[in-house]
């Protein structure tokens, strides 16, 4: 989950980098926080996609096979 504190710290370091620069330790921290943020974002996006079913105008399921396979692998019900 993407915590408010994580985002606040990333934003603080971004402002500091723009205004006065970062120490090497802060640069490493910023990189680590960015990686954590991206990992959480990707996981949240994947969870959202797992819950999606795509249908055409006639109501026929046209969900891509790759997404169906992912849902099946993770035991997600296709509505």
Swiss-Prot record:
Cellular component, GO, one term: cytoplasm
Record keywords, A-Z:
Cytoplasm
Subcellular location per UniProt equals:
Cytoplasm
> Which InterPro entries does this UniProt record tie to the protein?
DUF896 (IPR009242)
Q: Which Pfam families match?
A: DUF896 (PF05979)
Question: Would I find Lyase among this entry's keywords?
Answer: no
Protein origin, superkingdom? Bacteria
Is Transcription set as a keyword in this record?
no
| Family that this chain belongs to | Belongs to the UPF0291 family.
List, alphabetically, the HAMAP family matched.
UPF0291 (MF_01103)
Q: Spell out the NCBIfam families in the cross-references.
A: PRK01546.1
The name of this protein is UPF0291 protein Bcer98_2342
Q: What is the lineage of its organism?
A: Bacteria, Bacillati, Bacillota, Bacilli, Bacillales
């Amino acid at each position: 989950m993407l915590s408010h504190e994580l985002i606040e710290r990333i934003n603080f370091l971004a402002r500091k980098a723009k205004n006065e620069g970062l120490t090497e330790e802060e640069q490493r921290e910023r990189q680590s926080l960015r990686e954590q943020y991206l990992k959480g974002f990707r996981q949240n996006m994947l969870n959202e996609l797992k819950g999606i079913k795509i249908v055409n105008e006639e109501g026929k399921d046209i969900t891509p096979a790759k997404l169906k396979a992912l849902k099946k692998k993770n035991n997600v019900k296709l509505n």
